[in-house]
């Protein structure tokens, strides 16, 4: 979203060749920042003080067979949940056929507008859909799909995005439940139940394909899990003194 606002201001066209390198560097930077944060946390600072690096970061203890089985079962139920969510599309729908609803038609035209205009800003990037008026409209989904679509493949890219959003949905639900409870039954059942819910994904991604709204919805469980873990860690560091270190 930040890039969609910055690029028009800097007169940089929104296309894969200009956006993907920035996203790639951001990913690498995030990984490096996480690694430094982890090292700072387990080592009590950045100074080695004569301690070997391997000892400073701690030796990773291999997980046992029981834990490995639980992880495998969890990912197995995530796969089942995804297949349940995606089966109507995979078994019936042709990826080359546009969804016969008014909302998907609007959003596919939005992707076309970005491909032609090279402007993905929420502050007017879809102006061609509003008679040239630069109105505010959230363009996160449109901007992302435009990176993978060509002028003749917007329909296919949009339909594939439904499958990607379904995967994010069931993974996020599993992540959220894993930080809320230690119940293995709940953890294994959640992705399967989540894949069969009527509102999401059946209605939002199969019946009406409300892609931008669905994008916001599927991100909620995973982001909630991240904030819960971060909040617990911050609370623990404050409780035991020393303040929040990372």
Residue map of PLM features:
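Membrane-interfacial loop-to-transmembrane alpha-helix junctions, especially the N-terminal start
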Residues: 1, 71-76, 183-189, 241-245
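Membrane-embedded, hydrophobic transmembrane alpha-helices
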Residues: 1-70
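Transmembrane-helix signature of membrane-embedded glycosylation machinery that interfaces
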Residues: 6, 173-182, 224-227, 231
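Membrane-interfacial segments
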Residues: 10, 14, 39-44, 180-185, ...
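Internal/C-terminal transmembrane anchor helices
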Residues: 64-89
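Active-site lumenal/periplasmic loops and adjacent helix-entry segments of GT-C-fold
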Residues: 81-218
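Transmembrane helical bundles and short interhelical boundary loops of multi-pass, membrane-embedded
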Residues: 95, 245-246
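Membrane-interface transmembrane helices that cradle and orient dolichyl/undecaprenyl
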Residues: 220-245
